[in-house]
A protein has these predicted regions:
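ATP/NTP phosphate-donor binding region
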Residues: 42-118
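Internal helical hairpin/lid segments
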Residues: 239-297
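Short, acidic/small-residue loops that bind anionic groups at enzyme active sites
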Residues: 140-162, 169-175
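Conserved anion/nucleotide-ligand pocket segment
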Residues: 171-229
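ATP/nucleoside-binding phosphotransfer catalytic cores, i.e., glycine-rich phosphate-binding loops
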Residues: 286-354
């Protein structure tokens, strides 16, 4: 009797093990299929807004601080010279505790610009502070359902992060003041105009002694370091796409070197620096470095980035007070090639319309 019970127990145990193994295999297969599926969908999710034509309307909105009326007027005149029709948002010139209206008013302008079918692109009037307040009032589906070029930089990085998170490309570029400048910026503004027509650029990367050699291809995201680090882990954080293979770019102004150090450490402990395929370091201006021990901001950044076997270029002309601030297409696939201590190429790979 004991022998029979023993064999029954063995049989039951084997059956349970086989069942568990089958369930485990099924789970693993399902996980693999879901992961592969997510990866395929993720690469297809980012769409390119339609190119603009002469006579198209561009909305000017103020999601951040209150703009100067003369600067907005110059921006409107420049857009007219480019062949477009500028329309200033209903609340774009408002003032409320330094912001261009309440958060609800600023969000209302963004929603109007996204939903109005006659508006083909959206230009932020200026940076400053406050764009993050607008995000919680704009469902990500609004960006996805109304794919339009959102243009700006600095505090507008929050909008770029949200739009790319929703699966739509945007343009990191100068705003009303920058596009109105003449002289040495004419070539930059010419590139901006080409982007709006759907013509993507290839940039030469300047030589820098700290540049790290390498070649990589990935989805370009970035902007103001302080702004996108402040969105860490939220649904508006484009770095949630890190597993898709990103080329990260960042710049900042007026920050203490110790604060930038903490932000780089945040990217490191989140595993972002170990997963990005390449990095473009833009201009850092008016930073403070009390007793840092580093010669400059780039030397401090290099202390972090030198440990990663990826292409890195420094002092690319993008960001505050860079003199040029070349436009970047966020969410676009790019090819980054950098020589050790030398220059290189950043090529935007124009996607097929989806």
């Amino acid at each position: 009797m004991q022998a029979v019970s023993y064999f029954i127990c063995i049989f039951v145990a084997q059956s349970m093990i086989e069942r568990e193994m089958r369930m485990t295999v099924r789970f693993v297969l399902l996980w693999v299929l879901m992961t592969v599926g997510r990866g395929a969908l993720a690469q297809q999710r980012i769409v390119m807004p339609a190119a603009l034509k002469a006579g198209d309307t561009i909305a000017i909105v103020s999601p951040s601080s209150t703009p100067d009326s003369a600067t907005v007027a110059k921006g409107c005149q420049t857009l007219r010279e480019w062949g477009y029709v500028p329309v200033v948002g209903p609340h774009a010139m408002n003032s409320y505790h330094g912001f261009a209206g309440t958060a609800d008013e600023r969000a209302a302008d963004m929603l109007w610009a996204l939903r109005d079918s006659t508006v083909k692109a959206i230009l932020c009037s200026r940076g400053g502070d406050g764009a993050v307040q607008v995000l919680t009032r704009i469902p990500l589906e609004e960006f996805r359902n109304h794919p339009k070029w959102v243009m700006g930089f600095s505090d507008a990085t929050a909008l770029h992060s949200a739009e790319v998170s929703a699966g739509v490309m945007s343009i990191h570029c100068s705003m009303c003041d920058g596009i109105s400048m003449r002289g040495e910026r004419d070539s930059v503004n010419a590139i901006h105009r080409c982007l709006l027509r759907g013509e993507f650029p290839t940039y030469k990367i300047p030589a820098h002694p700290l540049n790290q050699k390498g070649q990589a291809e990935g989805i370009l995201v970035g902007g103001n370091l302080s702004v996108f680090c402040g969105l860490a882990g939220s649904e508006y954080d484009f770095l949630n796409r890190a597993d898709e293979g990103l080329i990260l770019f960042f710049e900042d102004t007026g920050e203490q070197m110790s604060k930038v150090d903490r932000m780089l450490h945040l990217l490191e402990i989140r595993g972002i620096l170990s997963r990005v395929k390449g990095i473009v370091v833009g201009h850092f201006s008016k930073y403070k470095s009390p007793e840092s021990g580093f010669a400059d901001m780039y030397e401090m950044l290099h202390e972090y980035l030198r440990h990663y076997d990826i292409p890195v270029c420094y002092d690319f002309p993008i960001g505050h007070h860079s003199g040029y601030n070349y436009p970047f297409v966020e969410g676009c696939r790019v090819n980054l090639t950098v020589g050790q201590g030398g220059g290189g190429i950043l090529q935007f790979l124009r996607p097929l319309r989806m």
